[in-house]
Amino acid sequence: MSLSTEAKAKILADFGRCENDSGSTEVQVALLTAQINHLQGHFKTHIHDHHSRRGLLRMVSARRKLTAYLKRTDNARYTALIQKLGLRR
């Protein structure tokens, strides 16, 4: 249920600060968002997959913590990221 290498490379290119950036907050949030969106489609067909649902909730929690950190430290980057990803906040 993980993302393909090509999908990860595209996210790194879109959200990274430089070509080797794979750990910035924006990249981490973008990767988590892609994984969350992928799992949401999985749960439409596998309603009773509670084990994977727990993993989804962990990802949502991690994304929420990372976005809160980004909002606290650099509000301009936070706003740009939220608009680019289309998140609700």
Swiss-Prot record:
SUPFAM superfamilies: S15/NS1 RNA-binding domain
Keywords noted in UniProt: Ribonucleoprotein, Ribosomal protein, RNA-binding, rRNA-binding
UniProt keyword RNA-binding, yes or no: yes
CDD domains: Ribosomal_S15p_S13e
InterPro entries for this protein: Ribosomal_uS15, Ribosomal_uS15_bac-type, uS15_NS1_RNA-bd_sf
GO molecular function, one term: rRNA binding
BP GO annotations: translation
Assigned GO CC terms: cytosolic small ribosomal subunit
NCBIfam families: S15_bact
Assigned protein family: Belongs to the universal ribosomal protein uS15 family.
Function of the protein: One of the primary rRNA binding proteins, it binds directly to 16S rRNA where it helps nucleate assembly of the platform of the 30S subunit by binding and bridging several RNA helices of the 16S rRNA.
Subunit organization: Part of the 30S ribosomal subunit. Forms a bridge to the 50S subunit in the 70S ribosome, contacting the 23S rRNA.
PANTHER family: RIBOSOMAL PROTEIN S15, BACTERIAL AND ORGANELLAR, SMALL RIBOSOMAL SUBUNIT PROTEIN US15M
Protein name: Small ribosomal subunit protein uS15
Provenance organism: Shewanella denitrificans (strain OS217 / ATCC BAA-1090 / DSM 15013)
Gene responsible for this protein: rpsO
